Amino acid sequence: MACRSCVVGFSSLSSCEVTPVGSPRPGTSGWDSCRAPGPGFSSRSLTGCWSAGTISKVTVNPGLLVPLDVKLDPAVQQLKNQEKEEMKALNDKFASLIGKVQALEQRNQLLETRWSFLQGQDSAIFDLGHLYEEYQGRLQEELRKVSQERGQLEANLLQVLEKVEEFRIRYEDEISKRTDMEFTFVQLKKDLDAECLHRTELETKLKSLESFVELMKTIYEQELKDLAAQVKDVSVTVGMDSRCHIDLSGIVEEVKAQYDAVAARSLEEAEAYSRSQLEEQAARSAEYGSSLQSSRSEIADLNVRIQKLRSQILSVKSHCLKLEENIKTAEEQGELAFQDAKTKLAQLEAALQQAKQDMARQLRKYQELMNVKLALDIEIATYRKLVEGEEGRMDSPSATVVSAVQSRCKTAASRSGLSKAPSRKKKGSKGPVIKITEMSEKYFSQESEVSE
């Protein structure tokens, strides 16, 4: 009988096959089974191999037909199969990780080259912060100047508004004075018209009185003439007393003198009254004329001043409009400059923040790559130890032919112990390998998320 062991996984004893010496193995002929005798075969079996005519009876120990109780749990065998599958998956993953590590090492070398190249360059070329600070300082200086100019323009505007208010008050006063003067002028014109009418009436009365005086003179003269004619033509016989002498001519002369005195007095009184009225009207007319002339001159002066004030008001209004337009333009320009500076500052801050984030991301990637590299180095060292142990185990003989049942059982037990030892080693090494693999999977999942 010969015992052949099959090593599965880490040289674990999975089955034991017992075949007769004379019977051929599966897939071989009977003559192929008779080769160099090994230790443990009897002389009878040896002669049977060489003599085809006599085949000795094979005696089998019944104890060998009893299944060998190796005290192996099926769960342990299932666990070993599972470990074998995991080992295959880990080997595949290890191969992919090696490729990724090589790619990452190339990328790391490229990044280190770029980093050293960037560090070797002149920092002033890429140092845009100083330029941005200078530009921001200039913008702030311009903003400060615009604010000062705005304050000055506002002060000038207040002064101009005060002057405009003062001119408006003066203009309103002049308008009120002009209205008063116009009203006074109208009143004076009415008085002048009334005085002219009154003067005309007085002149008419004077003329009527003069004509009346002339008429009275004429009447008196005519009456005197008539009376003289009557006295001359009438012959009167008067018995006179010689004792009483009457002087009629003296009486007539006296009456005539009285009439003449009355007429002269009436004429003088009328002339004096007319003269006084004329002088009074002339004085009043001269007074009214002088006041009218002064009013006209004042009105002309007021018109000139009003025209000047209007022109000044128009110029002040145009100046105010120009100042308001300048203020509005300055405000718009200042607002645009401020918004532009604000936008550029925000862009610079965003660019700086993005650069910081990129730098932090590169540092994190570099750190993660270093961690992955360290983990892969540990994993490679672990796999190297496992491979070296496996190679050392595979260099030792894998099958032994025993001559006795007791020695074969001991050999099988020793082999089972040897197979358990690498299994325990594998179990002990399973933890860090799986942990490192999980770390690698976690890193590559993070890398795929970052790339997306």
Swiss-Prot record:
Residues 136-227 are annotated as: Coil 1B. Residues 119-135 are annotated as: Linker 1. It comes from Homo sapiens. Residues 252-390 are annotated as: Coil 2. There are two types of cytoskeletal and microfibrillar keratin, I (acidic) and II (neutral to basic) (40-55 and 56-70 kDa, respectively). Heterotetramer of two type I and two type II keratins. The record marks G334 as: Stutter. Gene3D superfamilies: 1.20.5.170, Single helix bin, Vasodilator-stimulated phosphoprotein. Residues 391-452 are annotated as: Tail. Weakly expressed in tongue, but not skin or in any other tissues or organs examined. Residues 412-434 are annotated as: Disordered. GO terms for cellular component: cytoplasm; cytosol; intermediate filament; intermediate filament cytoskeleton; keratin filament. This is Keratin, type II cytoskeletal 80. Pfam families: Filament. Residues 1-82 are annotated as: Head.
